Amino acid sequence: MTEYKPTVRLATRDDVPRAVRTLAAAFADYPATRHTVDPDRHIERVTELQELFLTRVGLDIGKVWVADDGAAVAVWTTPESVEAGAVFAEIGPRMAELSGSRLAAQQQMEGLLAPHRPKEPAWFLATVGVSPDHQGKGLGSAVVLPGVEAAERAGVPAFLETSAPRNLPFYERLGFTVTADVEVPEGPRTWCMTRKPGA
């Protein structure tokens, strides 16, 4: 039997509708999302949040890869994403509205995680998801690897945060190690993970 090889490429604006559906489905029940996004119209809110990350962060100032035409999506910021602060300042009010009744929890979680983020230039995996009906085919690693490889070529770390314990071995196989284990009061335990160059 031949091994399945996903088709991975940089995303375009044409990929947005399917990529947003993929990310929304992947994050609908994700622990951090459940903790920080209002349960009222939850999937609609998650969908819009993921669209903001995909379009305003990934496509506008970062890098986005899709596998199999959007069945898997990875959104990265890079050391060249110098406009990130301005973009987050612009979309921040809408993100706060989407958090709704969970805004205080979102702000608390952000405050707990921020000190563990790299101060030096790094590739930051802002969001990644695989469509539930395409999981287990290697699309996750296929869509994350281009960013990992770009960080390696640049000689800078790659960084991510996850609140799903099942994700830890997946990222460890890609060379990431846990650099912080953050207990969020009344929320999900969250791990910061870094992949140093040469890992």
Curated annotation (Swiss-Prot):
Keywords: Acyltransferase, Antibiotic resistance, Transferase. GO terms for molecular function: acyltransferase activity, transferring groups other than amino-acyl groups. Coiled coil: none annotated. Its EC number is 2.3.-.-. The keyword Transferase applies. Residues 6-198 form the N-acetyltransferase domain. It holds the Pfam family Acetyltransf_1. The keyword Acyltransferase applies. Disulfide bonds: none annotated. It comes from the Bacteria. It is an enzyme of class 2 (transferase). One of its GO terms (biological process) is response to antibiotic. Detoxification of puromycin. PANTHER family: GNAT FAMILY ACETYLTRANSFERASE (PTHR42791), N-ACETYLTRANSFERASE DOMAIN-CONTAINING PROTEIN (PTHR42791:SF1). This is Puromycin N-acetyltransferase. It comes from Streptomyces alboniger. The gene is pac.
